[in-house]
């Protein structure tokens, strides 16, 4: 594959693009599920909740039942949202808050693809030619920053210190469903273009994702797109219709 033309900005998806889809589905989601009952029992409809933020988020759900029945109903509802991978902003806020506990305890470490780390470091070293990197995920911005702040050090050549890496300094901005909207809607990408001041030259923005519906929504706004082809990703029947990226070595 020949080198890409010079873009003025990169907009990147996370799961299935920057890290394995399995990390989200098999590690992050189960970690949250493990704690759902506890956070509901300790904070929902409690006069003195253990965590005010969680209590505020849980109160947004319209649960008619009272007492223990209400708590059980909310637990069931949250588990259904997770099972269906529902893009619910309140759920995403709760997940990020719970994951923070796992990141801080060392239970959660992010297996970012090595070529992604190489790209971020290489791009940062371009000086005045550095291309801004933005992240767009359904996960909350809080969760995004946690993810980039706890990248597993797996012996990459750029490793300078032991333990997890904080790569947030390589990221120029973050977008989620609260700040931009759903990733399958073109208006969301219009908001992002406006925010990063690229409305007049959308083709100079490259959006990479493993989801064809997201790519199509971005294309409607004139954004250049590429399909992330990572092992374990869901097969895209019309993958041939998109420029395919197996690694970030050409960015």
UniProtKB/Swiss-Prot annotation:
It is found in: Cytoplasm; Nucleus. GO terms for cellular component: cytosol; nucleus. Pathway: Amino-acid biosynthesis; L-methionine biosynthesis via salvage pathway; L-methionine from S-methyl-5-thio-alpha-D-ribose 1-phosphate: step 3/6; Amino-acid biosynthesis; L-methionine biosynthesis via salvage pathway; L-methionine from S-methyl-5-thio-alpha-D-ribose 1-phosphate: step 4/6. Signal peptide: none annotated. GO terms for molecular function: acireductone synthase activity; magnesium ion binding. Its cofactor is Mg(2+). Pfam families: Hydrolase. Binds 1 Mg(2+) ion per subunit. Belongs to the HAD-like hydrolase superfamily. MasA/MtnC family. This is Enolase-phosphatase E1. The gene is UTR4.
């Amino acid at each position: 594959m020949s080198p890409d033309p010079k873009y003025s900005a990169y907009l990147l998806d996370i799961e299935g693009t920057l890290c394995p889809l399995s990390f989200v589905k098999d590690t992050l989601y189960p970690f949250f599920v493990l704690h759902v009952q506890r956070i509901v029992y300790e904070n929902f409809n409690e006069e003195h909740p253990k965590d005010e933020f969680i209590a505020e988020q849980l109160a947004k759900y319209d649960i008619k039942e009272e007492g223990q029945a209400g708590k059980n109903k909310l637990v069931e509802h949250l588990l259904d949202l997770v099972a269906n991978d529902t893009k619910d902003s309140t759920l995403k806020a709760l997940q990020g808050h719970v994951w923070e506990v796992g990141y801080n305890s060392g239970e959660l470490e992010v297996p970012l693809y090595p070529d992604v780390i190489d790209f971020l470091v290489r791009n940062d070293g371009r000086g005045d030619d550095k291309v801004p990197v933005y992240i767009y995920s359904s996960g909350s911005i809080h969760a995004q920053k946690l993810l980039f702040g706890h990248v597993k050090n797996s012996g990459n050549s750029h490793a300078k210190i032991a333990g997890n890496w904080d790569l947030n300094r390589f990221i120029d901005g973050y977008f989620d469903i609260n700040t931009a909207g759903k990733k399958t809607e073109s208006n969301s990408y219009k908001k992002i273009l406006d925010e990063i001041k690229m409305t007049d030259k959308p083709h100079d923005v490259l959006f990479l994702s493993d989801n064809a519906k997201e790519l199509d929504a971005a294309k409607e706004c004139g954004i250049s797109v590429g399909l992330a082809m990572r092992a374990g990703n869901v097969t895209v029947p019309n993958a041939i219709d998109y420029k395919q990226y197996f690694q970030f070595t050409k960015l």
